[in-house]
Swiss-Prot record:
Gene it is expressed from: lsrD
Subunit structure: The complex is composed of two ATP-binding proteins (LsrA), two transmembrane proteins (LsrC and LsrD) and a solute-binding protein (LsrB).
Topology of this chain in the membrane: Multi-pass membrane protein
Pfam families, alphabetized: BPD_transp_2
Lineage of source species: Bacteria, Pseudomonadati, Pseudomonadota, Gammaproteobacteria, Enterobacterales
Listed GO CC annotations: plasma membrane
Family of the protein in this entry: Belongs to the binding-protein-dependent transport system permease family. AraH/RbsC subfamily.
Natural source organism: Escherichia coli O157:H7
Stretches assigned to the Periplasmic side: 26-42, 137-159, 231-237, 280-285
KW Transport (keyword) present: yes
Keyword Transmembrane helix found: yes
Compartments reported by the entry: Cell inner membrane
Record's protein name: Autoinducer 2 import system permease protein LsrD
Keywords noted in UniProt: Cell inner membrane, Cell membrane, Membrane, Transmembrane, Transmembrane helix, Transport
Cytoplasmic compartment residues: 1-4, 64-67, 110-115, 181-209, 307-330
Length: 330
């Protein structure tokens, strides 16, 4: 517990240093309104990264969420284009996202194949389905499906009490998933499954039901992100989630989750989402090309993960150094 919270505090300190450093280059980075409203450009990544954290803590992984976002986005556009009332279209889109997650869970549970392989397959399945729907609707290129009601397109651009709506939804998701993972018996089951699925099964923990809930929640979060993105951009496109994969997984790992399962923290992921998002924005405001900013993001991930590994194993490192000092090589 102490180490985990220490890691989260270190991430928070790094976030402050990052903002101040970019603020020294461009003072706009220190403007509170800019910091709040610029989150709308990347906070949907966080909405997906939160349940993805729970999936990874359970020892699984889902890399299909980007395609799920694209499929849900274009499905929302097709439903609206077909004359379905907007509230019903949104509800059906959310159900579609949850269904995509359940498909992942069902295939993983009943085939016993590695989740990475299964979700790689569904990534292409959902992406292909999105392109098929897009072609059937006549939406080509970057145009997508438009013409949504103004009340819908304004939703993701509104603010409540000075906070943008996407950020508010992210904070609600943060509270829900934090309570679920860290304050409930079901959350403790997630950690146990990640540490040893066989022991969890012998302990009468509903492993399959838990995995279904986790993957369905990731699919549902992807659908929520899709609805927000369509509202934000005013267009439903099949490629809306194409760039989400690496930032989301980076945020989860950077936030402290063990990629092999058994440990992780929702708060850490939330801070890491802001860290990665503001890093990209700060580099863009500093005039750094996208290719360089992507490389720097990867370098940051490597440095921080190595630093965390050292902090978690510092006692073993001290013992190894002591042995080397007492038994120097000839």
């Amino acid at each position: 517990m102490r180490i985990r919270y220490g890691w989260e505090l270190a991430l928070a300190a790094l976030l402050v240093i990052e903002i101040v450093s970019f603020g020294a280059i461009n003072p706009r980075m220190l403007d509170l309104n800019m910091l709040l409203f610029s989150t709308s450009d990347f906070i949907c990544i966080g909405i997906v990264a939160l349940p993805l954290t729970m999936v990874i803590v359970s020892g699984g992984i889902d890399i299909s969420f980007g395609s799920t976002i694209g499929l849900c986005a274009i499905a929302l556009g097709v439903l609206f284009q077909s004359g379905v009332p907007m509230p019903l279209a949104i509800l059906l889109t959310l159900l579609l996202g949850a269904l995509c997650g359940l498909i992942n869970a069902g295939l993983i549970i009943y085939t016993k194949v590695n989740p990475l392989v299964i979700t790689l397959g569904t990534l292409y399945l959902f992406a292909g389905s999105a392109l098929l729907l897009s072609g059937m609707a006549g939406a080509t290129g970057y145009e997508g499906i438009g013409g949504f009601p103004m009340a819908f397109t304004d939703f993701a651009n509104l603010d409540v009490l000075g906070l943008p709506v996407p950020l508010i939804i992210f904070l609600i998701c943060l509270l829900v998933f934090w309570l679920w993972l860290h304050k409930t018996h079901a959350g403790r089951n997630v950690f146990l499954i990640g540490q040893s699925p066989r022991v969890a099964l012998y302990s009468a923990i509903p492993v399959n039901r838990t995995l279904c809930a986790l993957y369905a929640m990731t699919g549902l979060a992807s659908a929520v992100a899709a609805v927000l993105l369509v509202s934000y951009f005013g267009s439903a496109r099949s490629d809306l989630g194409a760039s989400f994969l690496m930032p989301a997984i980076t945020a989860v790992v950077l936030g402290g989750a063990n990629i092999y399962g058994g440990s992780g923290a929702i708060i850490g992921t939330a801070i890491a989402v802001l860290l990665v998002g503001y890093l990209q924005q700060g580099l863009q405001m500093a005039g750094v090309p996208n290719q360089v900013s992507s490389a720097l993001s990867g370098a940051l991930l490597i440095v921080v993960v190595v630093g965390r590994s050292v902090s978690l194993h510092r006692q073993q490192i001290k013992e190894w150094l002591a042995r080397r000092a007492n038994n120097p090589l000839p």
